[in-house]
C-alpha cells in the first residue's frame, strides 16, 4: 500500500472522458491510478480483473464500473509514459483494455518496437498508431490524469478510489471485494 493521506477523496470525479469498463451509474465506481511499468500496478490491475469477474457473476454487469487513469512515474519507470501513449492510441481505435492487458502482461518489454508489435497483434491500424505516437497526440490526456491524481494527493501509483474514497486497506481479493460491497450499501 502506498500511504499518502494528504487527501482521502477523489477530487476529479469519474466521467465519460475516462477509460471505463461498466456504466458510471454503477453501485461501485472504482478508479485506479496506475503505471504500466510498475509491478505493483500490474498486480493490482490483475486483482481488479479477477474481482470484476466475480462481482459481475454475483451482482450483474452494472454493479462495478472500473476506470483506469494514467499515473506514469517517469523518474523510476522511463517507459511508462510511452506505454500510456500507446494505450491511448489503442483507445482511439477501441482497444484500450486489450492494450492495457498486454502492457501489464509484458511490462518488462515496453520499448517502441514492442509497442508496435503489440498494436499489430491487436489488429490496430499501424500507420495511425505510429502517427499518434510520433506526434504525441495523447500527451495532454495523460497529463490530465496525472494532474487529477496530484489534486487527490497521489504521489505514486498504484492508488485506488472506491466511490470517490481512497482505498487504504490491504491489496488482496477478500479485503478489496469487501470494501467494494460495503461501499455499494
Stretches with model-predicted labels:
Residues 20-25, 58-59, 153:
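Short glycine/proline-enriched loop/turn "hinge" motifs that connect secondary-structure elements
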Residues 4-5, 9-13, 32-34, 45-56, ...:
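C-terminal cap of thioredoxin/glutaredoxin-like
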Residues 10-28:
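A short beta-strand-turn-helix
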Residues 20-21, 110, 167:
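Short clusters of hydrophobic/aromatic residues that line enzyme substrate/ligand-binding pockets
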Residues 25-27, 63, 83, 156-157:
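A structure-centric signal for secondary-structure junctions around beta-strands
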Residues 31-120, 181:
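Structural alpha/beta surface segment adjacent to cysteine/selenocysteine redox centers
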Amino acid at each position: 500500500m502506498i500511504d499518502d493521506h494528504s487527501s482521502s477523496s477523489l477530487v476529479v470525479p469519474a466521467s465519460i472522458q475516462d477509460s471505463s469498463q461498466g456504466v458510471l451509474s454503477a453501485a461501485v465506481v472504482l478508479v485506479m491510478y496506475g503505471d504500466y511499468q510498475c509491478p505493483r500496478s500490474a498486480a493490482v490491475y490483475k486483482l481488479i480483473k479477477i474481482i470484476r469477474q466475480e462481482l459481475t457473476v454475483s451482482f450483474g454487469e452494472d454493479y462495478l464500473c472500473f476506470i483506469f487513469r494514467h499515473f506514469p512515474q517517469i523518474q523510476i519507470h522511463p517507459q511508462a509514459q510511452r506505454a500510456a501513449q500507446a494505450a491511448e492510441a489503442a483507445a482511439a481505435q477501441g482497444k484500450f483494455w486489450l492494450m492495457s492487458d498486454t502492457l501489464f502482461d509484458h511490462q518488462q518489454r515496453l520499448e517502441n518496437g514492442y509497442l508496435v508489435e503489440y498494436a499489430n497483434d491487436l489488429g490496430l491500424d499501424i500507420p495511425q498508431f505510429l502517427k499518434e505516437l510520433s506526434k504525441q497526440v495523447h500527451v495532454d490526456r495523460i497529463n490530465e490524469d496525472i494532474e487529477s491524481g496530484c489534486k487527490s494527493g497521489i504521489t505514486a501509483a498504484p492508488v485506488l478510489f472506491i466511490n470517490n474514497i481512497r482505498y487504504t486497506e490491504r491489496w488482496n481479493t477478500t479485503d478489496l471485494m469487501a470494501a467494494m460491497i460495503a461501499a455499494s450499501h
